[in-house]
Amino acid sequence: MEQLKAAGYSRVALVSLDVIPGMEYNYDMGVYQNYKNDFKKMTLGTSLMYWQGQAEQADDVTETIKAMATQFPKQGKHDAILIMAHGTPQVSNAYYSVIQAKIDELGYKNVYVYTVEGWPSLETVMPKLKANGIKNVTLMPMMMVAGDHANNDMAGSEPDSHKSILEKAGYKVTPYIHGIGENKAIQAIYVERANDAWQALEATSK
């Protein structure tokens, strides 16, 4: 922001690359509040998942799930997909319950969301695998990039990694080491978010 000010920009559209409006999105809002009066016009776009389809708003959650589903492997009755999200100590952690509910509503069978640092945890989800006779598990991050959490917490060789825990429980595990930022359908949604922020900037400039 300081560089933009120094360069003489007067209109700024902030685009968030956050998945849900959690702690990092609060930081984005803080940046917006701190700098909005330093420019003639400034707007802030929403996170990947923000609106949930109520009160005539868009259903970002359903849109995102459908986009992620383009990378789901073909499933048999003994196969499950576990989607690893980050998790947050904030109230926005409730988004993951909404995501799971909409996954179920859309008819995706044996697809479960769990978190690294929130609820539900892997241990919360594992009983569902046993109850449904699952033998094969695909682990998939719901994060922009496949970084430390994906490579180590999810798919690492250490005994406390999610892959190791599941393998010890008798499951065949296949990690999918790609962030959702590589997903073309997700990229298209982020372009929509950027366009929304820009259009809001244009609207406030008239």
Task: List the predicted regions and their residue ranges.
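Extended amphipathic ligand-handling, pore-lining, and cofactor/metal-binding catalytic surfaces
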Residues: M1-T138, M144-K206
